[in-house]
Design a protein with these regions (language model features):
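Short N-terminal "domain-start" leader segments
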Residues: 1-24
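Short, acidic, Ser/Thr-enriched surface-loop or helix-capping motifs
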Residues: 30
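A short, exposed loop/beta-hairpin motif centered on an aromatic-Gly-Thr core
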Residues: 33-47
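A short, charged, amphipathic alpha-helix used as a generic interaction element across diverse proteins
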Residues: 43-61
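Short acidic DE-rich linear segments
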Residues: 64-68
Length: 68
């Protein structure tokens, strides 16, 4: 694994990395320290970064407005 990018957004951490198959993936760590790994694969780090930011936006909205 080769880390390409680490970004902090609204209490979340986005990690974009290249795996041994030379494809890119992302993981998110939330504000409580829980890591979320995704099965998506991307050809570029930029694409993984965009999708990771979108995932953080969804998680942030969900945490901001709980669905009890």
């Amino acid at each position: 694994m080769n880390i390409q990018n680490i970004i902090g957004i609204d209490g979340y951490t986005l990690i974009v990395y290249r795996s041994s198959d030379q494809l890119y993936r992302f993981s998110i760590i939330d504000s409580s320290g829980i890591a979320f790994n995704f099965d998506n694969i991307f050809l570029t780090a930029e694409e993984a970064n965009i999708k990771g930011r979108n995932a953080i936006e969804i998680a942030f909205d969900f945490d901001k407005h709980p669905q009890y």
